[in-house]
């Protein structure tokens, strides 16, 4: 009888252990294989981690969306939401019990003590260097340097292929990118998030008006009346997701100004989504590259 009891208890313990192991497997970024349990307080750092195959245990969400960015959401199904980057949910962060917290220097502010009281805190200046530099820095922290180098190598190779496809469509034409919101019309500058992928990675030539924009600002608000002055051969268009922005673009398309644009007449207007194109991260840029490849392969 005692033997049966012992055997029964042993089986129970084994079953519980197996369940525990399964739960650990399903928990994102638990401390295994030397990878710390990470809380990311930047959507861009989160997406850099995803590019390295690491799903953070917790992450902030997009401020406007109040959710993970659409192109990353599926990969973050087991990641705990920690509020928005500008105002993280400290209670959720504390409950997460991370091993390390990744913060964006610009959003974190000067007082890092509240984070350091919870866990070791790593600060990243996302205004310094490129997404490649950010990826490499993160890779050092998580022992994924080889993976980062390979990711960048693959990206650069694909960028060359897409660049060739674009050349066949646009030739030596000059390009600009605009964004339509409910209240504004914006022209993107050479600065991130849009500038680097269009004018550096994909080698497109910006119109003269874009070159003259303030390089410290990501965009400049303009009136639709000055659109013809840019004289673009091709235009990339981002329209905000809300209904008012969508309606604003439909109204713009009906105007004589829009219909008279060189790019419109040449049928070289290319609609692109805000995400992943405006997510200046390793993951965002790669997905934008994939979209460009599909767009210009048609």
Stretches with model-predicted labels:
Residues 114-183, 268, 279-298:
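Extracytoplasmic substrate-binding proteins
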Residues 20-23:
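Bacterial signal peptide processing site
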Residues 233-298:
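Structured C-terminal subdomain patch of bacterial secreted/periplasmic proteins
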Residues 68, 126-137, 173-197, 214, ...:
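Extracytoplasmic ligand-binding site segments that recognize negatively charged/polar headgroups
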């Amino acid at each position: 009888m005692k033997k049966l009891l012992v055997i029964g208890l042993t089986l129970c313990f084994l079953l519980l252990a197996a369940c525990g192991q399964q739960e650990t497997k399903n928990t994102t970024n638990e401390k295994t294989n030397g990878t710390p349990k990470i809380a990311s307080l930047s959507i861009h750092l989160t997406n850099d981690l995803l590019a390295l195959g690491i799903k953070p245990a917790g992450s902030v969400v997009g401020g406007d969306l109040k959710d993970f960015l659409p192109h990353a959401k599926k990969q973050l199904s087991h990641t705990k939401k920690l509020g928005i980057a500008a105002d993280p949910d400290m209670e959720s962060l504390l409950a997460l019990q991370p091993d390390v917290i990744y913060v964006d220097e610009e959003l974190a502010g000067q007082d890092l003590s509240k984070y350091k009281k919870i866990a070791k805190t790593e600060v990243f200046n996302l205004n310094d260097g490129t997404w490649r530099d950010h990826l490499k820095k993160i890779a050092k922290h998580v022992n994924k340097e080889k993976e980062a180098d390979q990711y960048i190598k693959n990206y650069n190779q694909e960028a060359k292929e897409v660049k060739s496809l674009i050349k066949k469509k646009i030739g030596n034409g000059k390009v600009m990118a605009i964004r339509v919101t409910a209240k504004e019309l914006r022209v993107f500058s050479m600065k991130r998030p849009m500038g680097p992928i269009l004018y550096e990675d994909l080698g497109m030539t910006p119109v003269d008006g874009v070159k003259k924009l303030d390089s410290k600002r990501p965009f400049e608000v303009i009136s639709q009346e000055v659109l013809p002055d840019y004289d673009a051969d091709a235009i990339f268009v981002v329209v905000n997701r809300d209904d008012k922005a969508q309606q604003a673009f439909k109204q713009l398309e009906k105007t004589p100004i829009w219909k008279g644009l060189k790019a419109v007449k040449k049928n070289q207007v290319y609609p692109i989504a805000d995400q992943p194109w405006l997510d200046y991260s390793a993951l965002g840029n790669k997905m934008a590259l994939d979209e460009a490849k599909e767009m210009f392969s048609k």
